Amino acid sequence: MSFKKIFVPLDDSELSHRVFSQALELALVDRAQVMLFNCVTINSLGETAVPIPVDLGMNAELMNQAYQAQRLRLESEEKHASGFLKNYCDAAAKQGLQVEFDCKMDGDPGHSICESAQNWGADLIVLGRRGRTGFAEAFLGSVSNYVVHHASCSVFVIQEVKAEK
């Protein structure tokens, strides 16, 4: 089986370095195009970048300050993500691969990954899994689990290596 368009969601973690290396190996086999991707996550309604109406009993100036702080945080995270994605892009380009990157702000990284991969026409998604189980997975969710069950293409999951006790 060969892959022509490999979609690779990354963050700035050690696991993402392994995911990138594995995706690069796969891409080199078939000279596949690569899309590197990051989703800057808006975690909750309290962190949205949308102003909240003053009639909720909140001081307008405080709400504006909170909104501005959130906007600056999101801009900073997007700039940081674009920086490390560009570094990954440069490394892939040195291997002779056709590579690009995209960064989106979204409250749901799993959905954003699936939607962006489908819109790009990916035939493979390579992503990492941190290995949460039980309550941690139920509480915090699992992006990789969501992607495996909702992606419109094949998914290759790289498991995080746990340190031995």
Give the positions of each predicted feature.
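Solvent-exposed polar/charged
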Residues: 25-28, 118-119, 149
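Small/aliphatic-rich secondary-structure junction motif
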Residues: 2-67, 93-95, 100
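Structural beta-alpha unit
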Residues: 1, 42-43, 75, 79-125, ...
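Glycine-rich, Arg-bearing micro-motifs that act as flexible, cationic patches
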Residues: 2, 12, 127-149, 160, ...
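Short, hinge-like loop/turn segments at secondary-structure boundaries
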Residues: 51-55, 118-120, 143-144
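A short acidic, glycine-rich active-site loop
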Residues: 58-83
